[in-house]
Curated annotation (Swiss-Prot):
GO MF assignments: phosphatidylglycerol-prolipoprotein diacylglyceryl transferase activity
Subcellular location: Cell inner membrane
Protein name according to UniProt: Phosphatidylglycerol--prolipoprotein diacylglyceryl transferase
Residues binding a 1,2-diacyl-sn-glycero-3-phospho-(1'-sn-glycerol): R148
The protein's annotated pathway: Protein modification; lipoprotein biosynthesis (diacylglyceryl transfer)
Natural source organism: Rhodopseudomonas palustris (strain ATCC BAA-98 / CGA009)
HAMAP family in the cross-refs: Lgt
GO terms, biological process: lipoprotein biosynthetic process
UniProt-listed Enzyme Commission number(s): 2.5.1.145
Alphabetized NCBIfam families for the sequence: lgt (TIGR00544)
Transmembrane feature ranges: 25-45, 65-85, 103-123, 127-147, 188-208, 212-232, 248-268
């Protein structure tokens, strides 16, 4: 074990307090991620050269979609946590499923909620589902980055014990005396910054002209980033390791990589093809 460890900074769990009303860091991360992602998506939708013509999604339609995807993230994230990470506990205490302020969200569940929101909104509003999925995935790393930073501020989801070769190891307040990897920051870099850069470069190279390509890339590279981060992250105590060093996060991410690769191959072979949908003016009238 290392002879020296970086002191974990002390943060107030409440980010903003106005009288009796308080917003915690994790909630603030969700709010900021949605707002910044919405602004970034609007910027992409207005750049016709990225789409090879007018965007197949109007700004008005995307503004309406934000509420749908927000609900999908929250419901899916909570449902995923209940089913994948702590089902036995919630079977015994079902009322606590609704106590979101106590924490407990799953990315994989939130992603499935996003998929449901994209499909349902696209079907209802006659918006091209693949293009809507592409733009949603393009902004996803923003929320992932902010969420992992909030995990770090809260001193939760810490890493595995580190050895002397890791001078930046930290002793987390609720994780015992051993210095540990700040795995939340690793994941913020991999799932947030790294994934955002990859997708942004692909978009700049014309990926939005091939509907579904960004979806496939997101699935693939997020899955790889999450699997890598899991090697440094302490598994959830109620689950532990499943098989050898396999964790629940790895188990849920492996199918993402496989599906993502298949989607990218299929999309690339299909080529650009026909325009994804009607112009924004015709879509807005639907």
């Amino acid at each position: 074990m290392p002879f020296f460890a970086v002191a974990f900074p002390v943060f107030d769990p409440v980010a903003v307090a106005i009288g009796p009303f308080a917003i915690r860091w994790y909630a603030l991360a969700y709010i900021a991620g949605i707002v910044i992602g919405w602004l970034y998506a609007r910027m992409l939708l207005q750049r016709q050269r990225l789409w090879g013509g007018p965007s197949p999604i109007s700004l008005e339609a995307f503004d309406d979609f934000i509420l749908w995807v927000t609900i999908g993230i929250i419901l899916g994230g909570r449902t995923g946590y209940v089913l994948f990470y702590n089902l036995d506990f919630f079977i015994r205490h079902p009322a606590e499923i609704f106590e979101l302020w106590k924490g407990g969200m799953s990315f994989h569940g939130g992603f499935m909620g996003c998929v449901a929101a994209v499909v349902l909104f696209g079907w209802k509003r006659k918006v091209p589902i693949l293009s809507l999925g592409d733009i949603t995935c393009a902004v996803g790393p923003i929320g992932l980055f902010l969420g992992r930073i909030a995990n770090f501020i809260n001193g939760e989801l810490w890493g595995r014990p580190a050895d002397a070769s890791v001078p930046w190891a930290m002793v987390f307040p609720n994780a015992g005396p051993l210095p540990r990897h700040p795995s939340q920051l690793y994941e913020a870099g991999l799932e947030g910054i790294g994934l955002f850069v990859i997708l942004a470069l692909m978009i700049r190279a014309g990926a939005l002209k091939r509907p579904g390509l960004i979806i496939g890339a997101f699935l693939t590279f997020y899955g790889l980033a999450r699997i890598t981060g899991e090697f440094f992250r302490e598994p959830d105590p109620q689950l532990g390791f499943l098989w050898g060093d396999m964790t629940m996060g790895m188990l849920l991410s492996i199918p993402m990589v496989i599906v993502g690769i298949l989607v990218m191959i299929t999309t690339w072979r299909r080529g650009r093809g026909a325009p994804a949908a009607a112009t924004p003016s015709s879509e807005a009238a639907s």
